[in-house]
Amino acid sequence: MKFKRYLQVTKPGIIFGNLISAAGGFLLAAQGSVDWWLLAATVVGLSLVVASGCAINNCIDQDIDAKMARTQKRVLVTGAMSTKAALAHGVVLGLAGFALLWFCTNPLATGCVLFGFVIYVGVYSLYMKRNSVYGTLVGSLSGAVPPVAGYCAVTGRFDMGAAILLLMFSLWQMPHSYAIAIFRFKDYEAAGIPVLPVVKGISAAKQQIVLYILAFAAATVMLVFGGYAGYGYLAVAVATSLWWLKMALSGYKRETDDRAWARQVFFFSIITITSLSVMMAVDGQTPPHSRAVMTADAGHYG
């Protein structure tokens, strides 16, 4: 079916993951006072842009996708869909998404999404992924944009809460991506993609995974110390971070099967970030300085 091909080229799994984090950022900022139309416009607009980026990424990556067992059945590699059709599909989705964000949210949220799109398509996909071991680091910025955009769609400003979300989700991307690179090591090696495990070895990647999880754990609790989230969120953040760290440290055991271990680290990374996105939504709080700003605004407009 033609529809199925057009859907597959947009990587629905990635869209769904970004939708969850965007909604988490939005609801964190909304603090229970939800503008449902704005939420719908934000997540739909963002999802369309993410779908656009994924479709264009498929066009860019089809040569290396043909070399990787995991991606050899993608529609552009098999010829089930033409590059021209996929590119046109991506452009239309992107234009629709940006139009929805521009007219229904605010310039800051739209600008955040544009930043993420340019980083993912223009910097990561076109150059860094193929040429630098730091491609994962650069790509992590685009992966951290959805919750920030969701947050800024509500607040209209880039404040400490937005900065914490950017840091937190960027740090999460690193062990998540390195774990993929370890259990898909042969694929990345065959395609000549300079990810850390291929360039510097699996041991170096394991060390980086542990360090980034520690940094991520510290970043997650900053939402609580900043007054943006409550103790329910804190309990989940501490529990998931510690379990993820324990799992990562188990990779140093002599009898460890690196591929199986990396899969566990990868799958738990998804559980971790999904749990935190949900808890941000249900246990968000208004920090004192934001309450002061809102009180001042209410006095000004009253």
From Swiss-Prot:
Record-stated family: Belongs to the UbiA prenyltransferase family. Protoheme IX farnesyltransferase subfamily.
Pathway: Porphyrin-containing compound metabolism; heme O biosynthesis; heme O from protoheme: step 1/1
Assigned GO CC terms: plasma membrane
Compartment list: Cell inner membrane
Record-listed E.C. numbers: 2.5.1.141
One GO MF term: protoheme IX farnesyltransferase activity
Keywords: Cell inner membrane, Cell membrane, Heme biosynthesis, Membrane, Transferase, Transmembrane, Transmembrane helix
BP term (GO), one: heme O biosynthetic process
This protein's record includes keyword Transferase: yes
InterPro entries referenced in this protein's UniProt entry, alphabetically: Protohaem_IX_farnesylTrfase, UbiA_prenyltransferase, UbiA_prenylTrfase_CS, UbiA_sf
Pfam family, one: UbiA
Protein name listed in UniProt: Protoheme IX farnesyltransferase 2
Source species: Chromobacterium violaceum (strain ATCC 12472 / DSM 30191 / JCM 1249 / CCUG 213 / NBRC 12614 / NCIMB 9131 / NCTC 9757 / MK)
Topology relative to the membrane: Multi-pass membrane protein
Transmembrane segments: 14-34, 36-56, 85-105, 108-128, 133-153, 163-183, 209-229, 230-250, 264-284
Lineage: Bacteria, Pseudomonadati, Pseudomonadota, Betaproteobacteria, Neisseriales
Function of the molecule: Converts heme B (protoheme IX) to heme O by substitution of the vinyl group on carbon 2 of heme B porphyrin ring with a hydroxyethyl farnesyl side group.
Catalytic activity: heme b + (2E,6E)-farnesyl diphosphate + H2O = Fe(II)-heme o + diphosphate
Note: Carbon 2 of the heme B porphyrin ring is defined according to the Fischer nomenclature.
Signal peptide start-end: none
